């Protein structure tokens, strides 16, 4: 059994990955950790999330002594922490020889010049960054298996890239237009006015400036127009994407492109039938649906995932299973 420490376990994503690892007979939880200043330190996870009443582990403060114990006892560490926190923790644990599964954006760009603009910090660990691989599980399995620094993709990029990567060679240079809606858990657990029950409403945000736009573009190899929206539901993402395909592309070409997922059990592709968020909520699945207009060459593809599962925790769990080869 492999031992995994989970840092940032009090948040939505941290609690979700805790539940997945707890249920995995090939893994054991070394410990659950929060920052030393957290109001949740010392509490059992089940006090914060009664859904996980079967998990009695406490949320321990991440002291220097705790970090040393993790380095001694664990095989891997999951970071469900803020980008600026993960930046330093990931480098430290990587240098101790642990495999790092980072759910933040601190290691998703290989080009360190991207970080000041999109994350507000200079990247201090170019050597560690050079080892980082992008953990899009269905596409980068070999790299995930070989590397000890796995940057788990963002939720919107996971939904968008799963839809677009199979058809990239069929697309023109016209920018794909991605309109995506996420449930409010994507904004995190901290209280905010715009995500409170009485205030939340369907609205776009981060227009022409969301940090997931360059993440999608980098991994796709093509610029995109990406507009995220906040929806008045708890969890899930629906991305509806319009792309122009090259002249002469046929419906059969599209079918063949998406056949790459025939052996991917977590990805379902349907033609002329579009996914619903409710069908993927609380699952590790991605549902794709597409329709093609041969007269105009436009393809519309919709992608539905659970933002806390396939968009975060269950994809991290996939990466753990791929890396430790079970």
Swiss-Prot record:
Where does it primarily localize? Answer: cytoplasm
What top-level class of enzyme does the UniProt entry assign? oxidoreductase
Which EC number(s) does UniProt give? 1.2.1.38
Give the UniProt keywords, A-Z.
Answer: Amino-acid biosynthesis, Arginine biosynthesis, Cytoplasm, NADP, Oxidoreductase
Residue ranges of the TM segments: none
Question: What is the protein name for this chain?
Answer: N-acetyl-gamma-glutamyl-phosphate reductase
Q: Which InterPro entries does this UniProt record tie to the protein?
A: AGPR_AS, AGPR_type-1, NAD(P)-bd_dom_sf, NAGSA_dehydrogenase, Semialdehyde_DH_NAD-bd
- The species is Shewanella woodyi (strain ATCC 51908 / MS32)
Its Gene Ontology biological processes?
A: L-arginine biosynthetic process
Molecular function terms from GO: N-acetyl-gamma-glutamyl-phosphate reductase activity; NAD binding; NADP+ binding
